[in-house]
Amino acid sequence: MRVADFSFDLPDELIARYPMAQRNASRLLTLDGNSGALGDKQFTDLLGMINPGDLMVFNNTRVIPARMFGQKASGGKLEILVERMLDDKRILAHVRSSKSPKVDSFILLDGGYQMKMVARHDTLFELELLSELTILEVLEAVGHMPLPPYIDRPDEDADKERYQTVYNQNPGAVAAPTAGLHFDDAMLDALKAKDVNIAFVTLHVGAGTFQPVRVDTILEHKMHSEWANVPQDVVDLIAQTKAAGKRVVAVGTTSVRSLESAARASQGELKAFSGDTDIFIYPGYQFQVVDAMVTNFHLPESTLIMLVSAFAGFDHVMAAYQHAIAQKYRFFSYGDAMFVTKKAH
């Protein structure tokens, strides 16, 4: 398939630049993967669609304030966007400046912290913090929330809370697992009260999630890698859920990629997984674990719309997006959501 097959025209006013006043106040478009049938709902209607005994899997990564500003020794301004933390002192990062910093040069961050440019890895820079503090402590002090480029505004104080799920736990993401932004504590409690099981995996979403696909055909695309963890207790819960004939519902494409990465690595019976994954899911992929998913509306030609198309069928998904545009759903990270069931192969 060609990347251009996943293109669609989106009116600019449908890009959500701010979240709704309440997390669960979004709209929800339902898509039946088998029939292609659509339903226009409110997000809170999801409660009625998840059955007792179903397992919902959330990504509990925490977004770090990954954007920092500073200057080179020459005085030239630069912007640093963390791609991933390597340890307490070192990061891999995207650096924007008029000229790339040289190896062994120094960077002065806002707030007076200093970093050294240690190495270059393709388009990424390895930077080392020269401080008693950890990278996380410096990010908390001077970092900005890394809002996606299409939100097209500076980050505000409210984003520190709203570009973060209520159940976040493990710091390391530089983009939010956005399907989870719709859930508040009351909704999680209501799911538990209904005997829906809840489990958590971790995938630290990288800035690569916003990188456009720059090739003509899908098979040419090289997927960025991200760190994921699927613990044994989640594997056990999945086995129990499947044995009882119930569904595994993944909240977000990152949860889908975590679970399917574990399945790919174990080649058959699902096992716990911890490590880097570069799984690229596109039409033709056979899903091993996930039966239904909650997901936001994704960018045209992105690997994420390809994943949803693999799940519910290309024609069904592209038709759903045209419906969403006609019905003025809000798109992307701060936008509305979909509840999608898997198309049988």
UniProtKB/Swiss-Prot annotation:
Function noted in UniProt: Transfers and isomerizes the ribose moiety from AdoMet to the 7-aminomethyl group of 7-deazaguanine (preQ1-tRNA) to give epoxyqueuosine (oQ-tRNA).
GO molecular function, one term: S-adenosylmethionine:tRNA ribosyltransferase-isomerase activity
NCBIfam families named among the record's database cross-references: PRK00147.1 (NF001140), queA (TIGR00113)
Catalysed transformations (reactions): 7-aminomethyl-7-carbaguanosine(34) in tRNA + S-adenosyl-L-methionine = epoxyqueuosine(34) in tRNA + adenine + L-methionine + 2 H(+)
InterPro entries noted in UniProt: QueA, QueA_dom1, QueA_dom2, QueA_sf
Oligomeric and partner information: Monomer.
Keywords per UniProt: Cytoplasm, Queuosine biosynthesis, S-adenosyl-L-methionine, Transferase
Protein name as catalogued: S-adenosylmethionine:tRNA ribosyltransferase-isomerase
Gene: queA
Highest rank taxon of the organism: Bacteria
GO cellular component term of the entry, any: cytoplasm
A Pfam family assignment: Queuosine_synth
The keyword Transferase appears for this protein: yes
Enzyme Commission designation: 2.4.99.17
Biological process, per Gene Ontology: queuosine biosynthetic process; tRNA wobble guanine modification
Record's keyword annotation contains Cytoplasm: yes
Compartments where located: Cytoplasm
Family: Belongs to the QueA family.
Pathway: tRNA modification; tRNA-queuosine biosynthesis
